[in-house]
Each structure stands twice: as C-alpha cells, then as structure tokens.
C-alpha cells in the first residue's frame, strides 16, 4: 500500500480542462499543420530536373541579354523556323531561368523552383477566415501542393501556379469583403504574368467568371428585394476589362491574348502526336505526356500518378463544400470552379490550376 501511495504522490495534480486550454491547443495544432504543409511544398520542390526545356530557356535568355533585352521576332535556335515569326510570349521567364543558371548553375534552378513552390504553399495555407481554425484549409492546401508537384520544374508552369494562387487569394478576400484595390492589383498581376507565362489567360479567365457570378448574385438579390442594382458593379466590370486588356501588355500582344487558341489548336495536338499514350513505352516514360490529353481518355487515365489523383480528389471536395454551403454568395467561385474543371477535363495540363481554385473554394 505504501508503494501505491508514493506513486499517487508523484503523479501531477489533475487540472480542469478549460476553454482557454482547448483554444491554445487548437492554435498550436493549426500552426504545426500549416507549416507542415509549407515544408511539404518546399520538399517537393527538391526534385530531379529531367526535362531539357530549361536548357532552351537558358540559351534564349542568354541570347536576349546579348542582343538587347526584348525577344527576337523569329526563332534563332531553329533552322526550319529561321525566317518565320515565332512569338516568345513568355520571354521574361527566359531571363529569370537564364540568370538563375548564370548565378548558381543547377543549384540556382533548384532554388528557383523550391522558392516558388514554398511561396505557393505559404499563400495557400494563409487563406482562411480570421479567428477560425485552419486545419481544414491546411489539408486542402496539402492536396493542392501534391496536385501541383509535377509542375515544380523551372518552366513557366511555376508562374502559372503562383499567378493563379495570387489571383484566388485576392478573389477570396473579395468574397470575405476585405479586398481593396482590385481595380489595379489584378490587371497589374496579369500584365506581369503574361510576360512570364503564355497561360496568363487562365488568370483573366477566372477573374471574368468570378465577377460574372458576383453580378448574377447581385441581380438575383436585387430582383428579390425590388432594389436597384448598386453602381458598384461598374467597378467590377472595370476590373474585368482591365484584367483582359492586361494580356496585351506584351511584346507580342496578338499571340498573348490568343494563347488559348494556339494552345488547344496547335500545341496540344502537336504534343499528342509526338507523345502518344497508347504505345507500350508510355507506362515507363515519365515525361508528363498525360498533360496534353483529356482526363476522359482511358489510355491517359491509366497513367495517372499521385498528382492527378490528388487534383481529382480536391475537385470533388470543392464541389461537395459548395453543395453543402448552397449560398448565392458562392456563385462566383462556383462559376470559376466549373469552368476550370471543364478545362482540366479537356487537357490534364490545367489540372494543377483547377486544384488551386478548388483548394481555395473548399478551404
């Protein structure tokens, strides 16, 4: 009995569980989960570079710095295209990759994609309602990071993910009513984005869809309350117009704004012909060939890896959250998610960006 009595004396006194203690543990858990997601993004940025495309970007940047900063009108690295116009819409990213290589070689390229991946992870995990636990937001961010992991390479796709994340961050703030300066933030973002990446039109596309949903919501509310639509809608249309017009701020304004046409009518069909998914070597060729095929293609679907599975799961989560919420205020996000899902069904290349939209919607 004395041993049991000594053991009881050594045990700490029981403390009552208070709401303050529960809140403190929740905050600590949210902090750890959030930074675990960011560390996962950084870790996934440390991957092998097995694509030769960055070498072309390096030489392109070197050539532009040696002959002026602006891109040439023709492809100087091709004998067959020497006399033909070859617009390099993403010319500014060539400079970024070339300078990264010039400063630190392959380590510079690795640091570039690690930094971009970390920024994307940081922004995704810090989009939440103030005062509300962020554990679910962090889980959605993890799914988005895994879905984007296949694009953590020193290519313009890095800019696509960062640009889409920034766009959704500002639209999320607008949804919460805490956004300011969107009339200049979004157009400036897209103007810079379109010189770094030919897929900047995705950002303008999401902006148009989101504000279209906001306009529909305002009209429904005004019709039910017999109230006049507020003139604030004019500022929304101004933001939309400037965001689309920002695609013209490029040395090649025509090809920049027509990038989606070129992408779906020229680039993707050419890549499909070059990298088939129906031959026996497709299963051992880890060259991202599924990106150029529809997700509804059975041959492409069987080649899906963890990134595509995570993206599909996140899209499903986004639609489930919108279904459970069922509020008109989310029409903007619903329009954006529906159209980005449609684009990803058309070509798997857009699945990471659709996953980013879904992560913000679901979180």
Predicted regions and their residues:
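Membrane-interface transmembrane helices that cradle and orient dolichyl/undecaprenyl
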Residues: 165-183, 320-325
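Short hydrophobic/aromatic helix or loop-helix immediately within or flanking a transmembrane segment
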Residues: 80-107, 111
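Juxtamembrane membrane-water interface segments that cap and precede transmembrane helices
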Residues: 88-99, 258-309
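Transmembrane-helix motifs of polytopic, lipid-linked glycan transferases
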Residues: 111-131
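Short hydrophobic alpha-helices at membrane interfaces in multi-pass membrane enzymes
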Residues: 173-191, 234-238, 334-338
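Short acidic/glycine- and proline-prone juxtamembrane loop motifs at membrane-interface regions
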Residues: 152-159
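Membrane-interface helix-loop-helix junctions at transmembrane boundaries of multi-pass membrane enzymes
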Residues: 129, 218-236, 303-310, 316-336
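Membrane-interface alpha helices of multi-pass inner-membrane proteins
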Residues: 41, 144-148, 183-198, 207, ...
């Amino acid at each position: 009995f004395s041993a049991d009595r000594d053991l009881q004396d050594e045990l700490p006194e029981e403390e009552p569980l208070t709401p303050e203690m529960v809140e403190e543990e929740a905050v600590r858990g949210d902090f750890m989960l959030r930074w675990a997601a960011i560390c996962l993004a950084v870790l996934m940025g440390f991957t092998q570079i097995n694509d030769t495309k960055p070498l072309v970007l390096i030489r392109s940047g070197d050539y532009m710095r040696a002959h002026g900063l602006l891109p040439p009108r023709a492809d100087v690295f091709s004998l067959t295209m020497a006399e033909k116009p070859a617009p390099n819409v993403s010319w500014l990213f060539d400079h970024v990759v070339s300078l990264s290589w010039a400063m630190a070689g392959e380590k510079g390229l690795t640091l570039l994609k690690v930094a971009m991946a970390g920024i994307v992870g940081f922004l995704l995990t810090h989009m939440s309602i103030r005062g509300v636990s962020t554990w679910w937001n962090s889980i959605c961010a993890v799914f988005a990071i895994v879905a984007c992991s296949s694009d953590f390479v020193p290519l313009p796709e890095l800019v696509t993910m960062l640009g889409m994340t920034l766009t959704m961050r500002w639209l999320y703030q607008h949804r919460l009513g805490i956004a300011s300066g969107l009339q200049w933030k979004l157009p400036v973002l897209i103007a810079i984005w379109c010189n770094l990446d030919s897929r900047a039109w995705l950002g303008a596309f999401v902006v148009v869809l989101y504000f279209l949903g906001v306009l529909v919501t305002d009209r429904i509310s005004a019709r039910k309350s017999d109230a006049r639509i507020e003139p604030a809608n004019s500022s929304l249309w101004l933001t939309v117009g400037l965001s689309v017009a920002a695609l013209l701020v490029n040395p090649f304004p025509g090809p920049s704004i027509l990038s989606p046409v070129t992408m779906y009518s020229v680039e993707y069909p050419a890549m499909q012909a070059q990298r088939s998914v129906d031959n026996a070597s497709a299963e051992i060729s880890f060259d991202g060939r599924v990106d150029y095929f529809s997700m509804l293609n059975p041959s492409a679907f069987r080649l899906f890896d963890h990134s595509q599975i995570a993206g599909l799961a996140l899209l499903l989560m986004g639609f489930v959250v919108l279904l459970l919420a069922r509020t008109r205020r989310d029409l903007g996000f619903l329009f954006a998610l529906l159209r980005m899902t449609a684009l990803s069904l058309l070509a798997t290349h857009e699945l990471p960006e659709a996953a980013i939209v879904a992560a913000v919607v679901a979180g």
